[in-house]
Every structure is written in structure tokens, then in C-alpha cells.
């Protein structure tokens, strides 16, 4: 049986932010969410979050996770004190794994290795070799066995040169852990209760300390400031890009891709540079995404293409469709197969059926467009009276000329044609030409005003 404790009580002063450190975004999700998601891959019986600073914000962020346990650390008295708050809530007969809300890159495979190599009556400790150990407790070994952890503030000059550091991640019996926590003291430079002090305590008790090194030091990086957050972002984006390419996705430049959520791709997908994917995005097979796009919570189906500089959110795009360049699809844009949406077209909360085209400079809002409809350049659905939104319906085969205003609520009939420059407010019957224009006039005696020189 497994209990997981995640420490998330720190204020994160070096972030210089009103947002708690563990809620800072990484790849579109809070730091703590990454750790919780990794925890779930280990199939724990219980997950306990230790919170403190701005705890109400943290709990609100994860209110949908009703299975989480919450332990409050009122005073920031060190990691040992924080873990003690959680051991009051977890089962004493379980094994316990301690993780950190500001160490979001930790891989589930690494944690499974840590636990699989654990023996009874010992502590399994995750360590790492860092280019620089600055900011971390150093691992003290004797005959290759871990003997102690020295916090940097208490380390000698020789000890500070040690590259193997303590990640803080450990695995042991909950009952043993609680016993050691009860024996901690705060006789150190910071006057805090260090979780790391239990290592020396356990060694003195004859308990073996099993130190397991992480494969990549980056996955145990703690995030304390915006620079470290940016470094973690680049590392995670690199990892995500490599996973996509391993699945067969073609990336024009893996270093110029941002995934801020979940991206699912079919076969033979191509993604050009500087595209941002947010939320849950699904790309079907043989989909091509041009450069400089923002795509959020959208499905794009097989053989469709998005040209450069489009903004797409909350949309559904069917097969063999073409979007952009410079198009905007807002939430509720639902496009069927073989649909063309061209440059400077905005679509909001509208359905566009198979084979229809909206090629240039148009606004389509709260509309229902049938099959094989041609919407001319500069067409506007006038859907809002200042209070209410109204629907425009354009039926199959209709042809809308350029510069047309459709004043909703209005219906354009099947195979109807609307003449260019018309303002249509009373509907248009099927199989007919409908146009509405003011009389053209020419004043041959008119003189253009001129500025005084």
C-alpha cells in the first residue's frame, strides 16, 4: 500500500509573484498538477498535499480532485515539520513516498525504479549528479553507502564541492518515518526541522540508506525563480517534442514548438515553427499546421491544413478542410469536411456544412451555413442588437455576393443568390436573386474641399 506526500507549502518569494509557487504555469499547467499527475501513475492509495501560503488558492485550483488529502502547515518550520503534518493523515502501515510540488519534471519511471529497488527496513533516497550543487543538500557517502545529508548552509567548503545532491525524494515505511520525525530538532543555522536529518538518525539506528541516482539531473530540478521556471519549460518542451517525433510527427524545428496542455497526433502530421498548442488539441492523420499559429481546445481531422498566423480556439474542423492564413475560429466554430476559410475571416459559434467557402474578410457569428455555400468577401452577419444575439441561416447552395450585411434573424433560402453590397433583413427566397441597394447618384458640379495653403 502506497501513500504519497507532496510538499507544497512554500511561499516562493523569489518568484516575485502573488501566485503561489506551485501554481506557476509549466507547459500550460500548474507545477503541482504535473506532480499530482505523475503520482497517479504510481497507483497510490492516498495522496496528501501539504499546503501553507495562499492555501485557499491551491485548494481551489484542485477542488475537482476530491480524492486528495490536505494537510495544513501553519508555520514554515522546515521540510521535516511539513512532512509531520501529513503523517497525521496517512495510514501508518503504508509505504510513503515524499515528493515536492516545485519539482515537476520527475518521471514516473524514475520513481518506480526507486521503489522497486527498495528493501525492507531501509530508506530509499533519490539522488542526482548536478553540474552545480548550489542550493541543494550534499550526499555524504562512506564505502558507497549514504551516511548523511549536509544542507548547504551547514556544509564545509570541502562538502560544498560534492556534486551528488539530495533531491529530497525518499521512500520508506510510514511508521518508521513518523518515529524519526518525532525525534527531529532544529539545532541548525536556520532553526528549522530538516527532513534530511532523519538520514543521519536512521544511520545511527542501523538502518540502511539506499541511494539511487536519477537518470537525468533535469528531472529533479527544483523551481524557485522565473529563470529556473523558464529552464524547466525549455526542458519539458524538448521532451514533449522528442516524444512527438518518436511517434512519427514531423517538426520543422523542435526548439520552436510549445505545448501547453495535451496534443494528440495521427500519422504523417507536420507542424511548422512557432505554433502554440493549448488545452486539449487533436490532430488527425496527414494534417499540416503552418507557422505562427495558436490552437486551443480544438479537433482538426484528417487531411486538413492550417496556414500561417491563425488563431483557433474551441473549434471543430472536419476532413480535407483549409484554414487561413490569418483566420480566426472562436469557440463554437464547427466546420464540416471540405470547408475553406480564408484570410481575415472570423467565425464564432457557427456551423459550416460540407463544401462551403468563406474565402475573404468576413465575420460569421451565430450562423448556420449549409452545404456548398459561397460567402463573398466582406460579408457580415449582424447578430447583436446590444442585448441579444440572433441567428443567421444560409441554406444549401446559396451564393452571397461581396460586401453583404445579413441582419439577423434572417434566412437565406436554398440556392438563393444575394447581390453584392446588399443589406438583407427580411430573408431571401430560394432559387432567386435578392438585392437591396440605395440609388446611385452622381453630382457633376460637386467640388472636393481643399485645404488652405
Task: Name what the model sees in each region.
Residues 165-266:
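Conserved alpha/beta core of the MobA/IspD/sugar-nucleotide pyrophosphorylase nucleotidyltransferase superfamily
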Residues 56, 66, 106-189, 196, ...:
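Conserved core of the sugar-phosphate nucleotidyltransferase
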Residues 250-435, 440-441:
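Structural signal for interior beta-strand "rungs" in well-ordered beta-sheet cores
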Residues 2-6, 32, 46-49, 225:
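Hydrophobic targeting segments
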Residues 3, 45-47, 95, 122, ...:
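Residues at the starts of beta-strands that form the adenosine-phosphate
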Residues 1-17:
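N-terminal nucleotide-binding beta1-loop-alpha1 segment
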Residues 18-35:
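Short catalytic helix/loop segments, enriched in acidic residues and glycine
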Residues 30-109, 113:
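Conserved N-terminal catalytic core of the sugar/cofactor nucleotidyltransferase
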